[in-house]
């Protein structure tokens, strides 16, 4: 917003978190009008570990819906496994959900993985070049060490697909068991400012950016 790309009712929107009436406001991103339907909900959840990404669990485990404070029938955009933390989008916008999760649209997801042991530049290169998993080859758009500790290393990875436990399996395939995994970003939306176990509504410009990157 601060770059002047978002306009509301003919004026630049520069205040993060500004509120507008989606049913009447004219919202533009990069000069292109964005239609945000008033009857659609768009939420961001900072998912804690221990919650499954489903509406109801036959085993009685806690689900992400237990954390969503809305009466609207929203659904997760893709999945995070129970042990994975971080950014999970929820919406009742079916077409947007379909496009955000379809490999054709190459929507980037950013993860911060903590693994045991030191991680070399060569190991990061292997993740980008691609590794073979049981369900086919997988590769990261980028993989970089962001923090080194005495016994553990943090690696940031960007992927454009969301196969089951893909990040964990990729790292395990090259010898690095994952001890903690957090998704920090989905497309243009990031996790900053949202405490674990809480949600916030997406701002109109964030909804607009999500629509834009998948051609809606």
Which ranges hold each PLM region?
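Basic, flexible Lys/Arg- and Gly-enriched helix-loop patches that mediate nucleic-acid binding at interfaces
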Residues: 1-216
